[in-house]
Amino acid sequence: MIYYQNGSSQHNLSHEDLKKSLIAALDKLGRKHKILAIPPDYTRLPSRAGELTEMVWEYYGNTLTDILPALGTHTPMTDEQISHMFGKTPRNLFRVHDWRHDVITLGEVPAEYVKEVSEGKVDFSWPAQVNKLLVEGNFDLILSIGQVVPHEV
């Protein structure tokens, strides 16, 4: 479902363009009570996901209870990196993803499908895993901000 679209390869979105777009999309989602935002980590700084995350915090206020940068297997972000990427977003909202201990398995991607999409390069099932906060946090909205997509480790 598309909540809002704007821009093209010939148009650079300004801060105000981003804010207007984000607010239009969030307005359509309606009122929420407990929100988790999952932006990319510092390695994706140019994506402007930090700017968007700060706007999400400004929009939702205290209902944005957790921010879980999608570290994957990267090292946790430093305070300086968080400040640089996420501006004035409160530091107490940030959680660190521990990929060795904080993941739970939701299910399994069947070997047949893995083989099909990998064009025969991989022929075994793959666990579908997420950080346990997504399941145990009782969120009524989980926002994937920017270039966060599931992938293998």
Residue spans of the language-model regions?
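An acidic, phosphate/nucleotide-engaging active-site surface
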Residues: M77-V153
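A Trp-anchored, charged/polar loop motif used as the substrate-binding/catalytic surface
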Residues: E16-S21, F124-A128
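Glycine-rich phosphate/diphosphate-binding loops that line cofactor/substrate pockets in enzymes
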Residues: K20-L36, G61, G137-N138
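Primarily the HKD phosphodiesterase
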Residues: G61-T75
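Short glycine-rich or small-residue beta-strand-to-loop segments that form or flank ligand, phosphate
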Residues: K34-L45, L68-G72, I142-S144
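N-terminal amphipathic/basic leader segments beginning at the initiator methionine
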Residues: M1-D17
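Histidine-anchored nucleotide/phosphate-binding helix
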Residues: L45-T63
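Conserved active-site and cofactor/substrate-binding residues in soluble primary-metabolism enzymes
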Residues: L13, D17-K20, S47, E51, ...
